[in-house]
Amino acid sequence: LLDSPATGQDKRLPLNGILDRANLAGREAGSAHAEVVEFLSQPGAYPGHPADVQIIESHMSLVFLADDLVYKLKRPIKLDFVDFTAIESRRVSCEREFEINQQLAPGVYLRTLPIVRNSAGSLTLGGEGEVIDWLVVMRRLDSAQALDAQIERGEVRPPDIKQVCEVLARFYLGQTSLDVDPDVMLGRWEEGVRLIENALTDPAFSLPSELIDPPLVSLRRFLANESDLLAARVELGRILEGHGDLKPEHIHLGPPILLIDRLEFDERLRWCDPFDEVTFLGIECARLGAPWIAPQLESGMARLLGERPPEVLLEFYRCYRACLRARLSIEHLRDESPRTPSRWPRQARAYLRLAGESLKNGDQTNGNSSLTGSP
């Protein structure tokens, strides 16, 4: 994992704030989690007793940076799409995360490790005793080499994106097509649009209709009139298990290029058309200030995979992904104790503007779009 937090995470938060959230409402699971967090925040918990332990908090995990290693702890949470309240579910998730990241991030994910209460009642990393939680142990990477950091510094160049495309193409070409019912996939898209619409139009969030309406109308129109294009991708065998969370902060330009944090907790969330996943990455790069990356990703993947979907389908993918990110951003405000609450409406509006741009620009390869151009 990188040695500083990815976009969307809070950097080195005060321990008391993290413990307050871990202990929320005095729940037993929260109390046990708070004990583990306090233990892992101490340098004495780790081999070699590092001088300092830095903590990064995300929605689903806590990451502890200790010298050249990273220790990732799943939070005992229950959401619509995942339930980590049981120790066994966290163990399974840790083991799965270790396994599925070997291909795209070799040498980064080192092992899983139990947190144990020994006979004296003390917590230790490994050893004999009662297992009370699990960690994924990773090699610490240089955050300066992450794609998001390089975008921020203005250092990303077309050859970098070409190499990312080559890594992705090798990965996709090595995957087996999934035997999925087209109606199942269409149902997922329809449900996704329904959830997006419900969230973005919730009066509690006060998102402006001029940002919401055009992309929602476009998404509904596509599903009503062009859904056969989605079914065709299934029938052509283009649906496979992708990365599942292909964000710029998860791409380490190296060398070598490493793609970390492949989504582990639900394989169905990795089911995708490679071009859908790549448009997601392009949208994220555009939000960070590098809109030229999106068309290069799409054209590079088309060249390497030997095909390019119809432009109307790519436009749907772009619009859907931007709207989905807007939905996930604004729904942070539904959390019992949302972190940085002022941030999420701003971020949702930024994604909605990108969704609108994807519609206004049509073919993004024509050189007239704000999503094209070169650095």
Question: Model segments located where?
Answer:
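The feature marks either
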Residues: 1
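Short, low-complexity intrinsically disordered segments enriched in A/P/G/S/L with frequent Arg
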Residues: 4-5, 11-13
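Intrinsic-disorder-associated interaction segments
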Residues: 8, 26-33, 189, 212, ...
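Intrinsic disorder/low-complexity segments enriched in polar/small residues
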Residues: 10-12, 198, 285, 361, ...
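Non-catalytic regulatory/interaction regions at protein termini and inter-domain linkers
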Residues: 12-49
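Conserved ATP-binding subdomain of kinase catalytic cores across diverse folds
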Residues: 34-235, 239-243, 248-324
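ATP/Mg2+ or Mg2+-diphosphate-binding catalytic cores
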Residues: 327-371
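P-loop (Walker A) phosphate-binding loop of NTP-binding proteins
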Residues: 374
